[in-house]
Amino acid sequence: LDVHDPLVKECIQTIEEKLRINTGIDGVPRYEGDRYYIQSEGVSNPWYITTLWLAQYYARVAKKPEDLDIVTYWLNWTVIHSPRSGVLSEQLHPFTGEQLSATPLTWSHAEYVRTVDMYMAKFSEFSK
């Protein structure tokens, strides 16, 4: 589907309203009620990959430089919630931000690099 398709926009709105966690560390779990490695009843763990996919959507639909602020937010979120080693895990504790599950997870690193690349490409478009 095209990123501007109404169905995609509705999906993103649902992610923002129903999936995005508001426990203090923010982030996006895989799906509503995800219990894999659950740390706190009733709150799913945020995953790097799903959170970065949300950032990638915003990079794709950005129409002006200010629209990239949310992408910057999620890139900074990733850095803030990574250990000093820079190794990214699969998911995070929803309250403490502690790394959980598979560590390191190449997929998490790949999506971070991909998001940075998308950000830079879009930023370059605006700089022309």
How would you describe each model-predicted region?
Residues 1-48, 73-128:
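Extended glycan-interaction surfaces of carbohydrate-active proteins
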Residues 42-60:
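Internal helical hairpin/lid segments
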Residues 53, 70-73:
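Extracytoplasmic/secreted proteins, especially bacterial periplasmic and envelope-associated proteins
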Residues 62-63, 120:
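Short coil/turn linking the two alpha-helices of tandem helical-hairpin repeats
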